[in-house]
Protein backbone atom coordinates (compact mmCIF):
# COMPACT_ATOMS: atom_id res chain seq x y z
CA UNK A 1 0.00 0.00 0.00
CA UNK A 2 1.58 3.27 -1.10
CA UNK A 3 1.19 6.65 0.56
CA UNK A 4 -1.91 7.67 -1.40
CA UNK A 5 -3.65 4.35 -0.81
CA UNK A 6 -2.83 4.53 2.90
CA UNK A 7 -4.30 8.03 3.09
CA UNK A 8 -7.46 7.08 1.21
CA UNK A 9 -8.01 4.11 3.51
CA UNK A 10 -7.61 6.44 6.48
CA UNK A 11 -10.18 8.87 5.05
CA UNK A 12 -12.64 6.00 4.74
CA UNK A 13 -12.00 4.86 8.31
CA UNK A 14 -12.46 8.39 9.65
CA UNK A 15 -15.51 9.01 7.43
CA UNK A 16 -14.00 12.18 5.99
CA UNK A 17 -15.21 13.70 2.74
CA UNK A 18 -11.72 14.75 1.79
CA UNK A 19 -8.29 15.90 2.93
CA UNK A 20 -6.35 19.04 2.04
CA UNK A 21 -2.56 18.65 2.13
CA UNK A 22 -0.27 21.67 1.96
CA UNK A 23 2.94 20.91 3.89
CA UNK A 24 5.97 19.98 1.73
CA UNK A 25 6.68 16.90 3.87
CA UNK A 26 3.23 15.43 3.40
CA UNK A 27 3.02 16.43 -0.27
CA UNK A 28 6.21 14.49 -0.85
CA UNK A 29 5.12 11.46 1.15
CA UNK A 30 1.54 11.13 -0.09
CA UNK A 31 1.95 12.51 -3.62
CA UNK A 32 5.65 12.35 -4.47
CA UNK A 33 5.72 16.10 -5.17
CA UNK A 34 8.97 17.96 -4.46
CA UNK A 35 8.09 21.45 -5.68
CA UNK A 36 7.42 24.43 -3.45
CA UNK A 37 3.95 25.60 -4.47
CA UNK A 38 1.01 23.21 -4.53
CA UNK A 39 -1.66 21.57 -2.46
CA UNK A 40 -3.45 18.26 -2.77
CA UNK A 41 -7.09 17.42 -2.32
CA UNK A 42 -7.75 13.73 -1.75
CA UNK A 43 -10.99 11.80 -1.31
CA UNK A 44 -11.62 8.08 -0.90
CA UNK A 45 -11.59 7.63 -4.67
CA UNK A 46 -9.93 10.69 -6.20
CA UNK A 47 -6.72 12.66 -5.84
CA UNK A 48 -5.81 16.07 -7.26
CA UNK A 49 -2.70 18.25 -7.16
CA UNK A 50 -3.39 21.96 -7.64
CA UNK A 51 -0.36 24.02 -8.61
CA UNK A 52 0.74 26.90 -10.85
CA UNK A 53 2.29 26.86 -14.31
CA UNK A 54 5.84 26.42 -12.94
CA UNK A 55 5.13 22.96 -11.55
CA UNK A 56 2.47 21.39 -13.75
CA UNK A 57 4.97 19.36 -15.79
CA UNK A 58 6.88 18.31 -12.67
CA UNK A 59 3.69 17.31 -10.86
CA UNK A 60 2.54 15.28 -13.86
CA UNK A 61 5.80 13.32 -13.75
CA UNK A 62 5.99 12.89 -9.99
CA UNK A 63 2.43 12.48 -8.73
CA UNK A 64 1.27 9.03 -9.80
CA UNK A 65 -2.45 8.55 -9.26
CA UNK A 66 -3.15 12.29 -9.11
CA UNK A 67 -4.92 14.56 -11.56
CA UNK A 68 -2.89 17.76 -11.97
CA UNK A 69 -4.79 21.04 -12.11
CA UNK A 70 -3.16 24.37 -12.95
CA UNK A 71 -4.71 27.33 -11.21
CA UNK A 72 -4.55 30.81 -12.73
CA UNK A 73 -5.41 33.37 -10.06
CA UNK A 74 -7.34 32.00 -7.08
CA UNK A 75 -6.20 28.59 -5.88
CA UNK A 76 -9.43 28.08 -3.93
CA UNK A 77 -11.54 28.42 -7.07
CA UNK A 78 -9.88 25.24 -8.32
CA UNK A 79 -10.79 23.44 -5.10
CA UNK A 80 -14.41 24.57 -5.41
CA UNK A 81 -14.47 23.29 -9.00
CA UNK A 82 -13.29 19.86 -7.80
CA UNK A 83 -15.92 19.76 -5.07
CA UNK A 84 -18.64 20.64 -7.55
CA UNK A 85 -17.38 18.11 -10.12
CA UNK A 86 -17.71 15.29 -7.59
CA UNK A 87 -20.89 16.66 -6.03
CA UNK A 88 -19.31 17.25 -2.64
CA UNK A 89 -21.53 19.98 -1.26
CA UNK A 90 -20.93 19.50 2.44
CA UNK A 91 -19.33 17.31 5.07
CA UNK A 92 -16.07 17.14 6.97
CA UNK A 93 -12.71 17.88 5.37
CA UNK A 94 -9.43 17.07 7.04
CA UNK A 95 -6.68 19.68 7.25
CA UNK A 96 -3.15 19.72 8.64
CA UNK A 97 -3.90 21.66 11.80
CA UNK A 98 -0.25 21.79 12.87
CA UNK A 99 0.97 23.06 9.51
CA UNK A 100 -1.79 25.28 8.12
CA UNK A 101 -1.31 28.98 8.95
CA UNK A 102 -4.27 30.79 10.47
CA UNK A 103 -4.59 33.17 7.52
CA UNK A 104 -4.75 30.21 5.11
CA UNK A 105 -7.41 28.56 7.26
CA UNK A 106 -9.44 31.77 7.24
CA UNK A 107 -9.17 32.00 3.44
CA UNK A 108 -10.31 28.38 3.19
CA UNK A 109 -13.30 29.06 5.42
CA UNK A 110 -14.21 32.09 3.32
CA UNK A 111 -13.94 30.09 0.09
CA UNK A 112 -16.19 27.23 1.20
CA UNK A 113 -19.71 27.70 2.46
CA UNK A 114 -21.12 26.91 5.88
CA UNK A 115 -21.96 23.34 4.88
CA UNK A 116 -18.35 22.28 5.40
CA UNK A 117 -16.62 21.54 8.68
CA UNK A 118 -12.89 21.07 9.16
CA UNK A 119 -10.99 18.73 11.44
CA UNK A 120 -7.27 18.54 12.14
CA UNK A 121 -5.62 15.28 11.04
CA UNK A 122 -2.14 14.27 12.18
CA UNK A 123 -0.71 12.68 9.04
CA UNK A 124 2.56 11.93 10.82
CA UNK A 125 0.87 8.92 12.38
CA UNK A 126 0.29 7.48 8.90
CA UNK A 127 3.96 8.00 8.04
CA UNK A 128 5.32 6.48 11.26
CA UNK A 129 5.39 2.80 10.24
CA UNK A 130 7.75 2.50 7.29
CA UNK A 131 7.24 0.35 4.23
CA UNK A 132 10.10 -1.90 3.00
CA UNK A 133 10.93 0.53 0.18
CA UNK A 134 11.17 3.37 2.70
CA UNK A 135 13.57 1.37 4.85
CA UNK A 136 15.83 0.93 1.83
CA UNK A 137 15.98 4.70 1.33
CA UNK A 138 16.61 5.31 5.02
CA UNK A 139 19.50 2.84 5.04
CA UNK A 140 20.95 4.46 1.94
CA UNK A 141 20.81 7.90 3.59
CA UNK A 142 22.54 6.49 6.66
CA UNK A 143 25.21 4.74 4.58
CA UNK A 144 25.97 7.94 2.68
CA UNK A 145 26.57 9.83 5.92
CA UNK A 146 28.63 7.00 7.38
CA UNK A 147 30.87 6.72 4.33
CA UNK A 148 31.36 10.49 4.18
CA UNK A 149 32.37 10.58 7.84
CA UNK A 150 34.97 7.86 7.30
CA UNK A 151 36.53 9.98 4.56
CA UNK A 152 36.47 13.06 6.81
CA UNK A 153 38.44 11.19 9.48
CA UNK A 154 41.30 10.73 7.01
CA UNK A 155 41.44 14.49 6.41
CA UNK A 156 40.64 15.90 9.85
CA UNK A 157 43.63 17.48 11.60
CA UNK A 158 44.52 20.09 14.22
CA UNK A 159 44.59 23.62 12.80
CA UNK A 160 41.50 23.04 10.69
CA UNK A 161 38.44 25.14 11.54
CA UNK A 162 35.10 23.57 12.42
CA UNK A 163 33.65 25.08 9.24
CA UNK A 164 36.39 23.51 7.13
CA UNK A 165 35.53 20.12 8.62
CA UNK A 166 31.85 20.77 7.94
CA UNK A 167 32.51 21.62 4.29
CA UNK A 168 34.48 18.41 3.77
CA UNK A 169 31.78 16.30 5.41
CA UNK A 170 28.90 17.90 3.51
CA UNK A 171 30.79 17.73 0.20
CA UNK A 172 31.50 14.03 0.68
CA UNK A 173 27.81 13.39 1.37
CA UNK A 174 26.77 15.31 -1.74
CA UNK A 175 29.23 13.39 -3.91
CA UNK A 176 27.68 10.14 -2.67
CA UNK A 177 24.13 11.10 -3.64
CA UNK A 178 22.78 13.22 -0.80
CA UNK A 179 20.60 16.06 -2.09
CA UNK A 180 21.36 18.28 0.91
CA UNK A 181 22.36 18.04 4.58
CA UNK A 182 19.57 16.81 6.85
CA UNK A 183 19.99 19.94 8.97
CA UNK A 184 22.65 22.50 9.86
CA UNK A 185 25.72 20.34 10.42
CA UNK A 186 27.07 20.46 13.96
CA UNK A 187 30.82 20.50 14.53
CA UNK A 188 31.69 21.41 18.11
CA UNK A 189 35.26 21.14 19.36
CA UNK A 190 37.04 21.74 22.65
CA UNK A 191 35.00 23.88 25.04
CA UNK A 192 32.18 23.96 22.46
CA UNK A 193 31.77 20.17 22.46
CA UNK A 194 29.41 20.39 25.45
CA UNK A 195 26.86 22.23 23.27
CA UNK A 196 24.19 19.80 21.99
CA UNK A 197 23.55 22.01 18.97
CA UNK A 198 26.91 23.67 18.49
CA UNK A 199 26.62 24.52 14.80
CA UNK A 200 30.02 24.67 13.08
CA UNK A 201 31.96 27.88 13.64
CA UNK A 202 35.31 29.39 12.70
CA UNK A 203 36.88 27.99 15.88
CA UNK A 204 40.15 26.20 15.20
CA UNK A 205 40.23 22.52 16.14
CA UNK A 206 43.19 21.93 18.44
CA UNK A 207 45.21 18.88 19.44
CA UNK A 208 43.58 17.11 22.38
CA UNK A 209 40.10 18.47 21.62
CA UNK A 210 36.95 16.41 21.81
CA UNK A 211 35.15 17.08 18.51
CA UNK A 212 31.45 16.25 18.27
CA UNK A 213 29.78 15.90 14.87
CA UNK A 214 26.00 15.76 14.39
CA UNK A 215 25.04 15.41 10.74
CA UNK A 216 22.95 13.56 8.21
CA UNK A 217 22.29 12.99 4.52
CA UNK A 218 19.07 13.17 2.52
CA UNK A 219 18.34 10.49 -0.06
CA UNK A 220 15.05 10.14 -1.88
CA UNK A 221 13.53 12.56 0.62
CA UNK A 222 14.58 10.48 3.63
CA UNK A 223 16.91 11.91 6.25
CA UNK A 224 19.61 10.22 8.26
CA UNK A 225 20.96 11.62 11.52
CA UNK A 226 24.05 10.49 13.37
CA UNK A 227 26.28 11.85 16.11
CA UNK A 228 29.96 10.96 16.40
CA UNK A 229 32.63 12.17 18.83
CA UNK A 230 36.36 11.87 18.23
CA UNK A 231 39.52 13.09 19.94
CA UNK A 232 42.21 14.98 18.07
CA UNK A 233 45.26 12.92 18.87
CA UNK A 234 45.79 10.70 21.93
CA UNK A 235 42.89 10.79 24.41
CA UNK A 236 43.48 11.69 28.05
CA UNK A 237 42.40 9.33 30.83
CA UNK A 238 39.42 11.58 31.59
CA UNK A 239 38.35 11.67 27.95
CA UNK A 240 38.54 7.89 27.75
CA UNK A 241 36.47 7.59 30.93
CA UNK A 242 33.74 9.96 29.72
CA UNK A 243 33.62 8.39 26.28
CA UNK A 244 33.31 4.90 27.77
CA UNK A 245 30.49 5.96 30.11
CA UNK A 246 28.46 7.35 27.21
CA UNK A 247 29.22 4.33 25.03
CA UNK A 248 28.07 1.87 27.70
CA UNK A 249 24.84 3.84 28.15
CA UNK A 250 24.21 3.71 24.43
CA UNK A 251 24.85 -0.03 24.24
CA UNK A 252 22.43 -0.63 27.12
CA UNK A 253 19.81 1.27 25.16
CA UNK A 254 20.50 -0.69 21.98
CA UNK A 255 20.22 -3.95 23.90
CA UNK A 256 16.94 -2.91 25.52
CA UNK A 257 15.12 -1.47 22.52
CA UNK A 258 12.16 -3.51 21.27
CA UNK A 259 8.67 -3.01 19.84
CA UNK A 260 6.33 -1.60 22.47
CA UNK A 261 9.03 0.12 24.54
CA UNK A 262 8.29 3.82 24.97
CA UNK A 263 10.85 6.49 24.25
CA UNK A 264 10.57 7.64 27.85
CA UNK A 265 11.49 4.19 29.15
CA UNK A 266 14.39 3.88 26.73
CA UNK A 267 15.65 7.30 27.74
CA UNK A 268 15.55 6.26 31.40
CA UNK A 269 17.64 3.15 30.74
CA UNK A 270 20.42 5.23 29.16
CA UNK A 271 20.07 8.05 31.67
CA UNK A 272 20.25 5.67 34.65
CA UNK A 273 23.43 4.13 33.27
CA UNK A 274 25.12 7.53 33.15
CA UNK A 275 23.82 8.43 36.61
CA UNK A 276 25.19 5.17 38.03
CA UNK A 277 28.65 6.30 36.92
CA UNK A 278 28.36 9.60 38.76
CA UNK A 279 27.41 11.92 35.93
CA UNK A 280 23.63 12.07 36.29
CA UNK A 281 23.68 15.78 37.08
CA UNK A 282 25.56 16.47 33.85
CA UNK A 283 22.92 14.86 31.66
CA UNK A 284 20.79 17.41 29.83
CA UNK A 285 17.29 17.40 31.30
CA UNK A 286 15.18 17.43 28.20
CA UNK A 287 13.32 14.96 26.06
CA UNK A 288 14.11 14.80 22.41
CA UNK A 289 12.25 12.82 19.80
CA UNK A 290 12.66 12.66 16.07
CA UNK A 291 10.66 10.78 13.53
CA UNK A 292 12.35 9.61 10.37
CA UNK A 293 10.29 10.88 7.49
CA UNK A 294 10.03 11.94 3.95
CA UNK A 295 10.96 15.55 3.80
CA UNK A 296 12.12 17.62 6.72
Locate predicted features.
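Active-site neighborhoods and metal-handling regions in enzymes and metal-associated proteins
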Residues: 1-296
